[in-house]
C-alpha cells in the first residue's frame, strides 16, 4: 500500500487576546498573533500546527513564504526530515533566520503531525519516545507588575495546575524593587520550590553585572537572557562571574545558533523556541547537540508540541507552560500536579476552534 501524498496547504491567522497583559522589559502585549497551518494529504489526513510570530504586521509575509516553500512538496509522500533539509539548503541565499525560518517551522510542525497521524501514533511515540507527564513551570504571569500584587498572583499561579515551579520577570528600574518582587513571590511559593527569572534582554552589560551580582544569592534556578541575546562575549563574562546558571536560547534561529552558543560555552542551560529553532526537525537536531555537550534543555512557549518533544530530548529539564493559545484550541492540553499531560491520540492532538479563528482573523 502506497503512502499518502501531499495535496494542499491552508494558512490562517488570528490575533488572540491574552488573559493577562504581558509586561516585559522588551515590550508589552495584549494579544498574541498566531498563524495556523493545515496540510491535507490524499488519504484525508490533515497535519496541523501553529506558530506565534508576535508581530501581526509581519504575518502576511510569513504566510506568503510558507506558500512559496510548500509548492515543492505537492504530490510527494510525507518525509519531514528530507523536506526540512531541502528547505534549509534552499534558504542559503536568504539566510537561516527570521521569516524563512518561521515559515519552515510552521510547515515542519504540520508535516510531522501528519506523519504521526498516518502512523497512528502520538508525536512523541512516533519520534521514539513514550507518553509520560512532562514537568513544567507556570509562565502565565509574574510580569513586571507592581510588586505588592505578586504575592496574590503567585498563589493563583500555583493553584492553577498545582505548580511548584514558577517564573518571574525582572529588570525593574530599581534593583530594590526586583529584590522585593522575589521576596513576595517566594513568600507564597516557598523556598523549597523552584523560582526562575527572566530579564527579557532588558539590561546593558554593566547593569547586568550589577543586578546579577546582587541577585546571585537569591536561590534562583536560572538567570534568563539578562542582555541582548547576540552578545556572546557579554554572556561569557556573566557566566564567569555568577554562580546562578545562565540560560538563553529562545532566540536561537535554527540549530546552527544553538551549536555556536554551546560550543563557545556562553550559557549553562538552553531553552529553544519551537518556531525560531525551525520546528520539530530543528528541535531534534538541537537536542542531539545539547546531549553531546551535556547541557540541560528546557522549552520556550508552544507547550503542546514542546512537551511531546521533551519526551525525546535526552537532557530535558523544564517545559514552559503558557495558556496563550488555549482559546484557539478545541482541546487544550491538561495540567496535573505541575505536569503537562500528553494526550494519547495520533499526532499532536492539536485542532483549531474555527469560530475563534474567524472572530480574531488577520487577513492574509
Roles of regions detected by a PLM:
Residues 213, 219, 230-339:
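Shared catalytic-loop signature of beta/alpha-barrel
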Residues 6, 44, 107, 120, ...:
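Conserved, mostly hydrophobic/aromatic
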Residues 28-36:
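Short catalytic helix/loop segments, enriched in acidic residues and glycine
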Residues 3, 10, 40-118:
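Metal- or metallocofactor-binding catalytic centers and their adjacent structured scaffolds
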Residues 35-42, 333-335:
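Short beta-strand elements
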Residues 4-18, 28, 298-364:
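Flexible C-terminal active-site loop/helix
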Residues 125-241:
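Metal-dependent enolase-superfamily TIM-barrel catalytic cores that perform enediolate-based chemistry
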Residues 49, 136-140, 164-168, 195-199, ...:
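Hydrophobic faces of well-ordered beta-strands that scaffold small-molecule active sites
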Amino acid at each position: 500500500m502506497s503512502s499518502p501524498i501531499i495535496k494542499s496547504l491552508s494558512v490562517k491567522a488570528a490575533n488572540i487576546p491574552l488573559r493577562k497583559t504581558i509586561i516585559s522589559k522588551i515590550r508589552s502585549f495584549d494579544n498574541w498573533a498566531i498563524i495556523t497551518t493545515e496540510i491535507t494529504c490524499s488519504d484525508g489526513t490533515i497535519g496541523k500546527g501553529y506558530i506565534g510570530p508576535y508581530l501581526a504586521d509581519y504575518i502576511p509575509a510569513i504566510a506568503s513564504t510558507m506558500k512559496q516553500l510548500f509548492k515543492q512538496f505537492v504530490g510527494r509522500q510525507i518525509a519531514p526530515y528530507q523536506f526540512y533539509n531541502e528547505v534549509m539548503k534552499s534558504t542559503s541565499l536568504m539566510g537561516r533566520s527570521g521569516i524563512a525560518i518561521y515559515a519552515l517551522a510552521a510547515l515542519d510542525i504540520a508535516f510531522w503531525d501528519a506523519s504521526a497521524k498516518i502512523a497512528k501514533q502520538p508525536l512523541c511515540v512516533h519520534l521514539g519516545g513514550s507518553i509520560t507527564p512532562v514537568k513544567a513551570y507556570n509562565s502565565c504571569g509574574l510580569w513586571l507588575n507592581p510588586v505588592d500584587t505578586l504575592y496574590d498572583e503567585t498563589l493563583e499561579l500555583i493553584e492553577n495546575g498545582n505548580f511548584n515551579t514558577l517564573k518571574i520577570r525582572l529588570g525593574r528600574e530599581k534593583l530594590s524593587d526586583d529584590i522585593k518582587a522575589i521576596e513576595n513571590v517566594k513568600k507564597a511559593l516557598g523556598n523549597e520550590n523552584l523560582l526562575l527569572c527572566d530579564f527579557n534582554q532588558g539590561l546593558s552589560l554593566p547593569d547586568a553585572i550589577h543586578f546579577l551580582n546582587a541577585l546571585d544569592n537569591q536561590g534562583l534556578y536560572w538567570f534568563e537572557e539578562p542582555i541582548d541575546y547576540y552578545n556572546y562575549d557579554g554572556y561569557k563574562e556573566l557566566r564567569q562571574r555568577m554562580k546562578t546558571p545562565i540560560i538563553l536560547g529562545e532566540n536561537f534561529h535554527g540549530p546552527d545558533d544553538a551549536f555556536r552558543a554551546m560550543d563557545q560555552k556562553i550559557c549553562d542551560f538552553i531553552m529553544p523556541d519551537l518556531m525560531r529553532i525551525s520546528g520539530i526537525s530543528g528541535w531534534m537536531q538541537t537536542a542531539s547537540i545539547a546531549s553531546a555537550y551535556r547541557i540541560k534543555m528546557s522549552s520556550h512557549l508552544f507547550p503542546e508540541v514542546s512537551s511531546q518533544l521533551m519526551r525525546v530530548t535526552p537532557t530535558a529539564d523544564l517545559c514552559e507552560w503558557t495558556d496563550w493559545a488555549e482559546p484557539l484550541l478545541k482541546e487544550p492540553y491538561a495540567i496535573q500536579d505541575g505536569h503537562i499531560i500528553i494526550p494519547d491520540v495520533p499526532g499532536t492532538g492539536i485542532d483549531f476552534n474555527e469560530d475563534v479563528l474567524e472572530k480574531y482573523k488577520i487577513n492574509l
